């Protein structure tokens, strides 16, 4: 007689890799056109002045400048402020 009951096979044990979402450039950081500022699912952060919104809701810089995050009416907004030429 077997002393061990037959083990069933588990249907768990898979996991997908992380999607590398989040803020890529922080407040006050220097960016050039095309730099990704935020990677997100949906608009957790809304686009403001001098930034574009990709079809996957990625926010990216349209100009050279500094990143600025602010909150207006419970919406997080990201802008890029142009740097004054000295």
Swiss-Prot record:
The terms under GO molecular function for this entry are:
structural constituent of ribosome
Transmembrane annotation, as ranges: none
Query: Source organism's superkingdom?
Result: Bacteria
- Offer one example of a GO biological process linked to this entry: translation
Disordered as annotated region, ranges: 1-26
Give the record's keywords alphabetically: Ribonucleoprotein, Ribosomal protein
Family named by the database record: Belongs to the bacterial ribosomal protein bL27 family.
Q: Which protein are we looking at?
A: Large ribosomal subunit protein bL27
User: Which species is this record about?
Assistant: Rickettsia typhi (strain ATCC VR-144 / Wilmington)
């Amino acid at each position: 007689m077997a002393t061990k009951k037959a083990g069933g096979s588990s249907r768990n044990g898979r996991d997908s890799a992380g999607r590398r979402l989040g803020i890529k450039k922080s407040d006050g950081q220097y960016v050039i056109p095309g730099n990704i500022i935020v990677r997100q699912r949906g608009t957790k952060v809304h686009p403001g002045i001098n930034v574009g919104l990709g079809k996957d809701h990625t926010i990216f810089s349209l100009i050279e400048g500094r990143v600025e995050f602010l909150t207006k009416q419970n919406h997080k907004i990201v802008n890029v402020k142009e740097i004054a030429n000295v």
